[in-house]
Amino acid sequence: MDFEAVIGLEVHAELSTNTKIYCGCTTEFGGQPNTHVCPICLGLPGSLPQLNKRVVEYGIKAGLALNCSINKVCRMDRKNYFYPDCPKNYQITQDEVPICRDGYIEIELENGEKKKIGIERIHMEEDAGKLLHTNAGTLVDYNRAGVPLIEIVSRPDIRTPEEATKYLEKLKSILSSIEVSDCKMEQGSLRCDGNISVMPKGSEKFGVRSEIKNMNSFKALEKALSYEYDRHVEAVTKGEILEQETRRWDEANSVTVLMRSKEKANDYRYFPEGDLVTLNISDEWIEEVRKTIPELPHEKAERFVNEFRIPKYDAMVLTLTMDMAKFFEETALKSEDAKATSNWLMGDISRLMNEKTIEVKDLKFNPEQLAELIKLINAGTISNNIGKKVLDDMFKSGKSPKDIVEEKGLVQNNDEGAILEVVKKIIENNPQSIEDFKNGKKRALGFLVGLVMKETKGKANPQIVNKLVSEEANKM
């Protein structure tokens, strides 16, 4: 029997507000433990919450960008549970009437088809504190308590771990592009839980689901869902009874581990938050927020394909972050060579950034300087290989490519007569390579070209070198 997965994701995005959701404490990441706190976020007796207007604005903005309907009347609710990281012993969240409902994200499958993944709801809530486990015991840091979140709950429309990854990637790019969250998974500002069950292909009856936590990267998400799918299929095939439970992804051992049996909604005893009034959202406010939404990543990618004539894949990669998209567009316009710009950004520049773990905004050179480098190569002033060396220098120093080329004497040699002398010398000193070439070994020419480039310290025009080596070898 063939099975398919039924997957839904719950994504928590930390909002990029300056202050917490119900008080004036800073949301800045880091800081000494328990220094970004006050009586409100510590839940001290007598303290009263006040809803941060910017949080509501960001909730509306996210909902509009994700094709949701905005609930014009919504409320906050108490979710009751006892855990050390929850200082009030309840979380102020939204239950029955969230701020947004019924949205979707469109993803592109491997075969090029597009698929809509439904979004059931988006609700606002506060984050909990953070537990720090030591040999001596467990400590609690409440700096994160009260930091505003939106939870985006998808419908169970996802059928493979790969689809789940595409959904999360698209969601991340949208949220970061509208600047409601920085979506830094390594800092916990974007967190994802997954719900998965399996059912026979063609069936409409979902199986017993498991919730998986601790999936803190795209790779972890895909691996955890794949593992859990295999575990469910094996259990069902053997006739075992699966129970609804919450499991944790163990990255070190590549397995999911049981945490607890799954709670039900009534275990949390939800009821309206009496210290906060019902929220009324006007049509005028919604339209004001709508005007602040920029061109979304998929819209920008489509425009790049049409305007700059770059491949669809390039456009999708370049629009994963708005900083990269902006850098590309500015460089492409200045260099008048969009494909070369795309190649440099997706290739050598991305490699250098990954090596140093930095982002586009941290680069020491600007789009104008990269455009200058591309123009130097296209004009034949320097070769592509020399261009890579110049880029390395630009990356370290931030100097302009022209200055680097002049300082280091890297101007390309286009003098055929001078290059021909070197070619003849190399051929004369390597008779075996000529013999190999005559015997049908085409790679022998590549060897000779490499020797010429080495002799000229990479300054000879590669096209001229290739032409002259081929001509001289055929004369022998």
Curated annotation (Swiss-Prot):
Q: Name one GO biological process term.
A: translation
Ordered alphabetically, the record's keywords are: ATP-binding, Ligase, Nucleotide-binding, Protein biosynthesis
SUPFAM superfamilies this protein is in? GatB/YqeY motif, Glutamine synthetase/guanido kinase
Q: What class of enzyme is it?
A: ligase
Give the organism the record lists: Clostridium botulinum (strain Langeland / NCTC 10281 / Type F)
- What family does this belong to? Belongs to the GatB/GatE family. GatB subfamily.
User: Which SMART domains does the protein's record reference?
Assistant: GatB_Yqey (SM00845)
This chain belongs to the protein called: Aspartyl/glutamyl-tRNA(Asn/Gln) amidotransferase subunit B
Top-level taxon = Bacteria
| EC number(s) given by UniProt | 6.3.5.-
Q: Which PANTHER family match?
A: GLUTAMYL-TRNA GLN AMIDOTRANSFERASE SUBUNIT B MITOCHONDRIAL AND PROKARYOTIC PET112-RELATED, GLUTAMYL-TRNA(GLN) AMIDOTRANSFERASE SUBUNIT B, MITOCHONDRIAL
